[in-house]
Amino acid sequence: MQAIVIAALVSVGVIAQAQQPTTAARPTLPAPDPPPSPAAMIARSKALELNTPYVPPPGDPLVHQAAGFAKVICSAVFITGLDPDFAAENVGYFTAPYEIRAKLGKPVVDREHKQVHVAVPGGVTRTAVFLGDQGCVTLPVGKDSVSFKPLELKSTLPDASTQTWPMGDLLRNEPPAPELNMAKVKQAVDAAFDPPEAKTAAFLVAWRGRLIAERYAPGITAQTPLESWSMGKSVTATLMGVLIQQGAYELWQPAPIPEWQEETNDLRSEIRIADLLHMSSGLRIKAPEDPDYDPTGTYADHFYLYTGGMNSFHYAATRPLQWFPGKVGRYRNTDPVLTNYLIRLAVENRGEEYLWFPRRALFDKLGMRTMVLETDPFGNFLAQGYEFASARDWARLGNLYLQDGIWNGERMLPEGFAKFVSTPAPAWVADHRPIYGGFFWINGDGEYPVPRNAYFMSGAGGQKTMIIPSHDLVVVRLGHFKGANEANQSFKNALALLMEAVPPNK
């Protein structure tokens, strides 16, 4: 059975068992704006394109997909705690497409050595190894170890069960606030799990910083770290915001990537940190959300930055410019990878341990105990999408933004940073797509039945953390990747019901 928790004002008040699945309420949803013409986007980008070469990633795509499959199963088993056969059927299609899995050997899980091996028929075997607090890492072909020293990152926080929300998981029993329609909230939770094919694993609603509802699929708890994919880009933005608040960088300064300083007149040296956060660097790679993407062509760099088993920072830094910075917005993993590069440079330049930085500077301060950031074999965070966390931890991060970057009286993010990440990037607006800010998506086209100033973290497979300032709401939905096709609609249905359940701010 799925447990449902409903409450108001302070966390959870009433704990009850969910009823047998019923048909959830299906509200009428407003129509979003029509999408821009791909042809017009392509034409505009072609007119601005620079004459630079494109060199695809090296290696056999099937070998890269085997690496992705091994890593996905490794993380599912050793981080989330899933059964390997369930994981092979249900999770992580992004770097290991379901249709490709039949072409590969069945994952071999070595629990003693905490490794997963996937063989390419007639070829190499790719291996992912669990490294504790660095999660699972794909080993380079021919290597049996990583090129960095893994660290145990123990939280300094007390046991979560002894601390009240949000710094802990202890939930106080208080009656619902009279202005909330808790029957509608219950309907919204039902809608988030309907249909079962959506594979929703966790759904959580926080109002004014306090939990008012949550439910988990069988085998999943409030402390289970789940696949979150590109919601990690928003973690990356937050870590950069912390560094800016600490004085390490300025938002609009040129990004001091070492590879761009080696030659005079390297136009990449004009890429600003804000351009990276805006997904508007102009760097040339192949990515699946490009309007002219051909999935039958060469293996996309966007995936290779996960599966290549190389120094991801150096690979991203050595891509040429396709457009001048800030002119064309494209959803490409180079930009968050390079932002993580800048994070490492700043942390190590002041003599601190890079792998410790997220926990000390962010996670422990917010009460986030479950977040795992995975790395490449060189110890570089792949926080463009290789991270795992519980729904409650994603809600904590969302509430930091709802509170304008202030937590327990401390300004953790610069004043105006939350507005920056939630304001449409100019290069995206130029394509009539007011949907992307600073490593956060924006409801600027009305795709979701919430106000258009709502903004959200989003990951492949239907992962969402929606921040709705007009209603003081943070809504988290996590699920298994196989349900991606149904997940978005069920999430929209849940949001529409929440808009009926929760009054707007006065």
Which residue ranges define each predicted feature?
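Structural helix-adjacent loops and short alpha-helical linkers that scaffold large soluble proteins
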Residues: P84, G247-L251, R344-R359, G405-L413, ...
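Beta-lactamase-like hydrolase cores
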Residues: G168-R208
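Short, charged, amphipathic alpha-helices and their helix-cap/turn boundaries
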Residues: A183-V185, V189-A191, R210-R215, Y249, ...
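Active-site SXXK
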Residues: G209, L226-W252, L276, T339-I343, ...
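Active-site-proximal alpha-helical segments within enzyme catalytic domains
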Residues: A237, M279, D335-R344, G385-W407, ...
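Active-site helix/loop module of the DD-peptidase/beta-lactamase fold
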Residues: Q246-R284, P288, T318-Q322, E348-G385, ...
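Active-site Gly/Thr loop motif
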Residues: M368-T375, K419-V474
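Structured C-terminal helix/loop/strand segments within mature extracytoplasmic catalytic/sensor domains
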Residues: M457-K506
